[in-house]
Amino acid sequence: MASASATATLLKPNLPPHKPTIIASSVSPPLPPPRRNHLLRRDFLSLAATSTLLTQSIQFLAPAPVSAAEDEEYIKDTSAVISKVRSTLSMQKTDPNVADAVAELREASNSWVAKYRKEKALLGKASFRDIYSALNAVSGHYVSFGPTAPIPAKRKARILEEMETAEKALTRGR
């Protein structure tokens, strides 16, 4: 086979340079870029952060007023629970009314806890903390060992001490 050696030549057209045609009839100013109708992530995050800060700072600016009637009711209910705990703990284990007294105490303590556990204003009070702890210890003992089982001396002393400190805190408004 005979090979033909051919060289490729590039053809370059000789055209005049292209000049854009300018129409001078009516030229309007350039249009502004189109408006965004969607939020960017940074816009959303800054909006979310601002709203979070505002909602949390509103609580400090205008705290909810606690009425004196609610405070008096808390003091009255708490004092009643304290006296019921003391009277139940002071009963002799041979007393035939121990089981009924324990049932009344559990009912009173459950209603007290259900009523005041939701109150955020009371959660930081020393009286609430001490009463709640003592009621938890008493209820836990009677649930575990039955209503006629006597509370051990050490646990009883701790419960009565918590009752005393809670009573002192109540008189001080804490």
UniProtKB/Swiss-Prot annotation:
InterPro entries: PSII_Psb27 (IPR025585), PSII_Psb27_sf (IPR038450). It comes from the Eukaryota. Disruption phenotype: Plants grow slightly slower and are slightly smaller than wild-type. Somewhat photoinhibited, in strong light the amount of D1 (psbA) protein decreased faster than wild-type and thus levels of PSII are decreased. The modification Phosphothreonine is found at residue 94. It is a peripheral membrane protein. Pfam families: PSII_Pbs27. Gene3D superfamilies: Photosystem II Pbs27. This is Photosystem II repair protein PSB27-H1, chloroplastic. Its main location: plastid.
